[in-house]
């Protein structure tokens, strides 16, 4: 390789290096505008309120006392079972962590 080739290569790399340095923009941490956050919050809360209202209307429209009583009974039985199984699981975990004495 000749010195001309190396000189040309160095010049090209130098120019490319300056181009890359010139292309870098100072990074600015742009904070999202409070107006945008408030708009998003308001839209989400309006969606949530409309979903709650629709669910309430559906519940009132299809309310049956017999079904409600069955659901309450099912809930009480399932919570009792879960508390029992949670106690068993807790005892097992504690015995594994404590080890044999």
Swiss-Prot record:
Superkingdom field: Eukaryota
Pfam families referenced in this protein's UniProt entry, alphabetically: Apo-CII
Transmembrane segments: none
One GO MF term: phospholipase activator activity
Prosegment residue ranges: 23-28
Modified how: Proapolipoprotein C-II is synthesized as a sialic acid containing glycoprotein which is subsequently desialylated prior to its proteolytic processing. Proapolipoprotein C-II, the major form found in plasma undergoes proteolytic cleavage of its N-terminal hexapeptide to generate apolipoprotein C-II, which occurs as the minor form in plasma.
Major place of residence: secreted
GO terms, biological process: lipid catabolic process; lipid transport; positive regulation of phospholipid catabolic process
Recorded family membership: Belongs to the apolipoprotein C2 family.
Identification of the protein by name: Apolipoprotein C-II
Gene: APOC2
């Amino acid at each position: 390789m000749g010195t001309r080739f190396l000189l040309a290569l160095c010049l090209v790399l130098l120019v490319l290096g300056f181009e890359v340095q010139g292309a870098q923009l100072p990074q600015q941490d742009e904070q999202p505008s409070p107006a945008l956050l408030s708009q998003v919050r308001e839209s989400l809360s309006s969606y949530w309120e409309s979903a709650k209202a629709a669910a309430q209307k559906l519940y009132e429209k299809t309310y049956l006392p017999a079904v409600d009583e069955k659901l309450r009974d099912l809930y009480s039985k399932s919570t009792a079972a879960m508390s029992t199984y949670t106690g068993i699981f807790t005892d097992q975990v504690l015995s594994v962590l404590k080890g044999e004495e």
